[in-house]
Amino acid sequence: MDLFDLTLHELHAKLKSKEVSSREATSAMLDRIAELEPRINAFITVTPERALAEAEAADRRIAAGEADVLTGIPLAVKDIFLTEGTLTTCGSRILNNFIPPYSATSFEKLKQRGMVLLGKLNQDEFAMGSSNESSASGPCRNPWNTDCIPGGSSGGSAAAIAARQATVTLGTDTGGSIRQPASHCGCVGLKPTYGRVSRYGVIAYASSLDQVGPLTRDVTDCAIMLGALAGHDPKDSTSVDRPVPDYQAALTNDIRGLRIGLPREYFIEGLDPDVQASMDQAIETYRRLGAEFTEISLPHTDYAVASYYLIATAEASANLARYDGVRFGHRAEQAEGLLEMYSRSRSQGFGSEVKRRIMLGTYALSSGYYDAYYLKAQKVRTLIMADFIQAFEGVDLILTPVAPTPAFRIGEKVNDPLQMYLSDIFTIPVNLAGTCAMSLPAGISGQGLPIGVQLIGKPFGEETILRAAHAFEQATEWHSLRAPL
């Protein structure tokens, strides 16, 4: 087996036994990236010199007996995470020359434990998109079919896992941006509960919705990564100060008596037949493992997408006001006066999807429309939260599709924003409710594209999700399938 094929826990065992070195594993990954990038475009920036230096430092730690499970493991992160001294663009022209002076807490935690940064991953511009087509660095492609999108906005994070270009990756999830790409690329993607992982140093899209999470090849790796990322951060007032469980200890495979809800609103007319078939197979697998199913209702699901796109764009309008060309990022030349410089810098620096969302958010917050749009959307969000609270009174987990269809072709929906937005119809409610959810490989379409199912847990119920996901993984082979590169 090639070194780039190993999971995190498999590579750790070989590093610990000194069967391989971190430098060897890192070199194998860098060679893989160089080989496949012309076809996949998963990376915006590759950092070979930094990676090899960090790998050699990790090997010294391992030799000194100071290593843990993450030391020497090759990692790549979405280009939304600040990485001190390394270009961070957020997929946008407006940040095409931005070198941050500090690092995101989530990345810094992994760096301190000896992980090796391979580079920064492609994404939709400012995490605004469901297909990775809005990136200023060009679209990322799905390793299972390079004519198809990998999902978004963390498309590069999922594609790099599927293409074996990184052992693990980091992404962010505002309305499904970890789970939808994970489903389309056949990997595991977890959106933790809001506040479980620090957002400090992550470029903000919608601050009340954004959350950091891992994308991995299997559930064990996901549990390891979540344990490393979770915890209170005094630099992030929205991070929650509560103990971090031993997530690996939750992987018991015993789910007898687990109560799983099936929300009737998610099994809609128009659901792709292959997605429905994968859901049916997943339900049958869980029944064999001893889980009990109950039909539930999440009655305000139909209003989730509209509510989300008012709240998220309103927050984006405020968050992106800081990009004006003055202190950092793209600055327009030949502007006559300050206001024209602001206008030209933003017009040249932002792409069309970002401009669309800024305009929508500004409109929703404007005088005379605030009550009708933004305030009403927040009221709907409260109702969606209440739906989940009520549903979880009778079940332990909720099982749903991740996306209505498998990955679609590049360019298919780029001129139809509404159809693009509906790609996240099953993932958005989780962000509005602030709870946790995972995408888990569960099938292959007739066209050979991966299909995931979504496990939704109670707030801070990641242990239950991981237990159920691991049991499913051990009973199936979907996670072990490889993209035909």
Curated annotation (Swiss-Prot):
Biological role: Allows the formation of correctly charged Gln-tRNA(Gln) through the transamidation of misacylated Glu-tRNA(Gln) in organisms which lack glutaminyl-tRNA synthetase. The reaction takes place in the presence of glutamine and ATP through an activated gamma-phospho-Glu-tRNA(Gln).
Complex formation: Heterotrimer of A, B and C subunits.
Active site, per annotation: 78 (charge relay system), 153 (charge relay system), 177 (acyl-ester intermediate)
PROSITE patterns for this protein: AMIDASES
Name used for this protein in its record: Glutamyl-tRNA(Gln) amidotransferase subunit A
Keyword line: ATP-binding, Ligase, Nucleotide-binding, Protein biosynthesis
Gene name as annotated: gatA
InterPro entries reported in the protein's UniProt record: Amidase, Amidase_CS, Amidase_dom, AS_sf, GatA
Enzymatic class: ligase
